[in-house]
Amino acid sequence: MENKKLKMGEIEALINSCVGKINRKSHVIKNHSFKTDSELKKRYETKKIPAASCFYKNINIKRIIKKLMLESPELTSWILHSDTKRLEIQDDLHHCGRKYDGHGYVECNSCYLVLGKEINPDGHIKKIYVRTCYPV
């Protein structure tokens, strides 16, 4: 797919629309955020998932996802040129700086984001969306 008609402002609009559609019922919020420290700790202990504090309490997950998207060197190329409908981004959460008991001994270190996209029959990108995002 060759989609050279999109300009940088249009790419930002796609990103903003994608992040704007994340809400309390979204998979990323509903399944990967925690209301209490004990809930986070329970998931850590029972599922052996070293959960990052960025998905805890009042942390703005939308802002984290947008930051991951904007800092990804592959995002623009994927939007403009790739036939692949899935993009995986894994990045450090060095900006987090928070620590909760639920972490156990695990540092808040990394986040895994999977994006999807819909393409019109004419080959132009219709929208991008978050398939999932979780701490690793």
Region annotations inferred by a language model:
Residues S26, S33-V136:
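Functional cores of ribonucleases/endoribonucleases
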Residues M1-N31, K35:
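Low-complexity, glycine/serine/proline-rich disordered segments
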